[in-house]
Amino acid sequence: MHIMVTNDDGIQAPGIQALASALRVLGEVTVVAPDRERSAVGHALTLNSPLRVFELRDGFYAVDGTPTDCVNMGIHSLLPFRPDLIVSGINHGANLGDDVTYSGTVAAAIEATLMGIPAIAVSLATQERSGHFPEAAQIAVRVARQVLSNGLPEDTFLNVNVPDCPAEEIRPPLVTRQGKRSFVGNVIDKTDPRGRKYYWIGSGEADFNDYEGTDFHAINRKHVSITPLHLDLTNYASMKVITTWVF
């Protein structure tokens, strides 16, 4: 088995190091990841500037681009084989609910899915500098083993979130639906010493709906959350209503 690993926290992040090491029990692992942190870049693809690749050591490639760039570089240029699985992570911080629309970690799994390769996005629900990444890596191995054995439905990947706690405290995985997060006041404006305005985005408070069956509900109770996500964003129920409109 050939497995490619990427992330959005950068190739030196502890999460990707733990993940790559753990996945070697399943087969050959190649890491193709951003050369620095690229969190919250979404599904960005670099089209207007060249990309550079640095081989840090055997099987570890740093790309000066986004997670989506890394998937493309790995599949079309760097890997001598088409991977059987692409695993993105382990992200430093949860990717729950609406977070997935911003996440570079999830975007890498989306890109792999677009290319017809089974994919998993893995995140650790922590804000601590040193979270339980080895424990999350072992969860990733268990999920990866199932995907390699059973495959995934077409246009579907798995978004896995792991609670940040010792292995003995992690409760059994739950298959969940995507929850809903709401952000309040997440833009702050400041003035620099020269009197010019500048802004910070993302520093506001975030709330979420803790509904049973959601990824939030599972993580808050120390369960592993496994959410199958698919690429077809069509709202089929709304199609019937909108077809009655007069354009």
UniProtKB/Swiss-Prot annotation:
The UniProt entry, under Pfam families, shows:
SurE
> Cofactors per UniProt?
a divalent metal cation
Location, primary (coarse class): cytoplasm
EC number in record: 3.1.3.5
- Gene Ontology annotations for the cellular component aspect, listed alphabetically: cytoplasm
Q: Which molecular function GO terms apply here?
A: 3'-nucleotidase activity; 5'-nucleotidase activity; exopolyphosphatase activity; metal ion binding; nucleotide binding
Q: Which residues form a coiled coil?
A: none
User: Does Lipoprotein appear among the keywords?
Assistant: no
Q: Which reaction does it catalyse?
A: a ribonucleoside 5'-phosphate + H2O = a ribonucleoside + phosphate
Please, which domain of life does this record's source organism belong to? Bacteria
Protein's UniProt keywords contain Cytoplasm: yes
Q: Quote the record's cofactor note.
A: Binds 1 divalent metal cation per subunit.
Where would you find this protein in the cell? Cytoplasm
Provide the binding site for a divalent metal cation.
D8, D9, S39, N91
Q: Which Gene3D superfamilies match?
A: Survival protein SurE-like phosphatase/nucleotidase
The UniProt similarity line reads: Belongs to the SurE nucleotidase family.
What is this protein's function?
A: Nucleotidase that shows phosphatase activity on nucleoside 5'-monophosphates.
Q: What is this protein called?
A: 5'-nucleotidase SurE
Q: Which gene produces this protein?
A: surE
